[in-house]
Amino acid sequence: MVVVSPPSPDAVAPTGSDARWIPDLLGPSYRRLELPLGTDPDGEGPISATLVRHEDSPDQPVAALLVVHGLSDYFFHTHLAEFLADRGIATYGVDLRKCGRSRRDGLTPHFITDLERYDEELDQALDVITADHPGLPVLVAAHSTGGLVVPLWLARRRDRGALDPVVGLVLNSPWFQLDLPDRARRLVDPVIRALGSARPYYRLPLKTSDRYVVSTHIDHDGDFHFDTELKPPGGVGVRAGWLAAVRRAQKRLQAGVDLPLPVLLLRSTASSVGTHRGDGVLDVDTDLILDVRSMERFADRVSHQVTDIPVDGARHDVFLSRADVLEVVFRHLGDWLDQTLAPHTKES
């Protein structure tokens, strides 16, 4: 069984290390760096993002990978970092503004009215990674809402001739569509736009369930340790201004971004969004959050080099699946990494 253990006590900073990197909640193998972002354009005061670095990465890595989370989430995937380290890859994770480690008193968790603003911390994170590893190829792995944010960010970098050193993208159950029937979506979109403009902080009265988070946490039905203050079982709520921003971004992505990059799409074979088995129990070994059919439908709008891997038994965050399923996920990820990095690996 794969288990992500509770964090160990903080380590002492290595001799000669950059003092800006401080001990992280994940323990001595991880350190974090604050990425200052100035004053919040949405009017909530000073904001920052947080970059986390795996300190046990190889001395001479072949690549670096940046992990970007989704809504009501943060970076805690130590098992992924260890898998990547074994393959010679240095891992970083970013907690975006108002998310995870970047939450502060007086800030509305995960709230933003334009997803393009995340470009600032993503650009900063990439600058830090390239300074740590000059000339090294970089990959990005993005989950759920992060899987919507990142392709659009990379498209804007491409448009200004700054896509390098990014050489590949992993999409982990990306959120490409508002999963409603077409007619309902057409009716709801004007309401979302109006509310997002008039009352951006309005918390929509949407039904939520804690089943997905409970199914993954080690104290309940899962194998993974994470902070339920930073990843709350019931979520952080959906604000009108945030959802309006998501819908604008989804429509831009659906129009096509056509990244000149290989893309790996990891997702479940099935969803149980709003559905139950006959005994009234949710099938937790499916995607409980999003409809995987939307991921399949819009993947080719991201790139024409998409490897779509539906994994039986995978959960919404495929890296939080059962141990036997995770083994399959890692096998596919490893194969894709080998293929993607081969043209960029220097001969010894």
Regions inferred by a protein language model and the residue ranges of each:
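N-terminal cap/lid segment of alpha/beta-hydrolase-fold proteins
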Residues: 2-59
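Short, surface-exposed "cap/lid" segments of acyl-processing enzymes
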Residues: 52-99, 103-105
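Conserved alpha/beta-hydrolase "nucleophile elbow" surrounding the catalytic nucleophile
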Residues: 69, 142-147
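Alpha/beta-hydrolase fold nucleophile elbow
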Residues: 132-144
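Catalytic active-site module of serine/aspartate enzymes centered on a nucleophile-bearing elbow/loop
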Residues: 305-348
